[in-house]
Amino acid sequence: MPHAPPLGALLRLYGAGTAVTCEPVDQGLLNRGYRLCTTRGRYFLKHHFDPDTADPAAIERRHRATQRLADLGVPVAPPLAHREGRTVAVVGGHAYALHPWIDGRHRHGGQLTRGQSARLGALLGAVHACLERVMPPKVHTRPATGPHPVRSADPADTFALIDALLGHVRRHRPADAFDELARHRLLERRALLEQHAARRPPRGGSVGWVHGDFHPFNLLYKDDTPAAIVDWDRLGVQPRAEEAVRAAVIFFVRPGGTLDLPKVRAYARAYRRAAGAPSAELAAAAHRVWWERLNDFWMLRWHYERGDTRADCQFPAASALAVWWTREYDAVCDAFVR
């Protein structure tokens, strides 16, 4: 097994028995996870591999937050403490955490009814409301670092990035269908940005504590009920309504790059009610996330700059969405605010 964790040392520290099976869980892009069965039970073993989030003290702070959320009834899977009373084990310079195994499956928006979509929005709204209760006041906290900065993208920087990516596409040999689609979308996006550059949003508004990475692979369902929100590595202070919009876009995008707007509407109504978020906050967030998508090329950067193709399968729908959203801007905004 590649990148095999030090099971003997970890299981002794946790008093979790002897390993029977240990299988990689392959959905994560930034960390490594394992389904671990031992003589004492079933667990999820997480190797905190991403250097941006792997500091043991920071991991333990997030662990304490999830335990407080669990105490408020939020469906999470707090980690287990080991024999030294901590929830992070550092072995060989690497940080690990052991969680109870949660039986469940991931579900995308196409598998949810409108009622279940509303329940999803209410869940995220409750998460935001509960985080305000269990986390320190925002005024004493620096905004989280990560892929969603408060300052909106500068189109001048995006034009330069498009030119650089087009250079990568031209140099890739042999050219393939992905290169052809990438070139088409880059040229298309450049034209859209030239047309809409004056619509760049101002700096973000109201911030709050957010999960930071709320999407289908970080939510487990048992039957029709959310069983656990996982992967709190990006917990931090960000514009909270932007997380709500961003999550809706990920959950409810269709394979052709359109959004299921009736489900978005049900989700957004429930979110606003649970989080106490006004419609104006959602409207501003929708505009900022639209602009973010118009300027975002992380999947192409992974492909061409890192040689990492794990996100390639997401690119056709994600790249088509930016174009469709621009064309249907008013309808999308209306779905988030009414």
Segments from the language model and where they lie:
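A cross-family kinase active-site recognition segment
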Residues: 110-183, 207
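Active-site activation/catalytic loop segments of kinase-like enzymes and analogous catalytic loops
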Residues: 241-276, 291-308
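Juxta-kinase regulatory segment immediately upstream of eukaryotic protein kinase catalytic domains
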Residues: 1-21
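Protein kinase glycine-rich loop
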Residues: 22-27
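A glycine-centered beta->alpha junction motif in the catalytic cores
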Residues: 96-110, 164-175, 247, 291-311
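ATP/Mg2+ or Mg2+-diphosphate-binding catalytic cores
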Residues: 160, 164, 168, 273, ...
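Active-site acidic catalytic loop and adjacent metal/ATP-binding pocket
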Residues: 29-38, 44-45, 79, 191-242
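ATP-binding pocket architecture of kinase catalytic cores
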Residues: 38-141
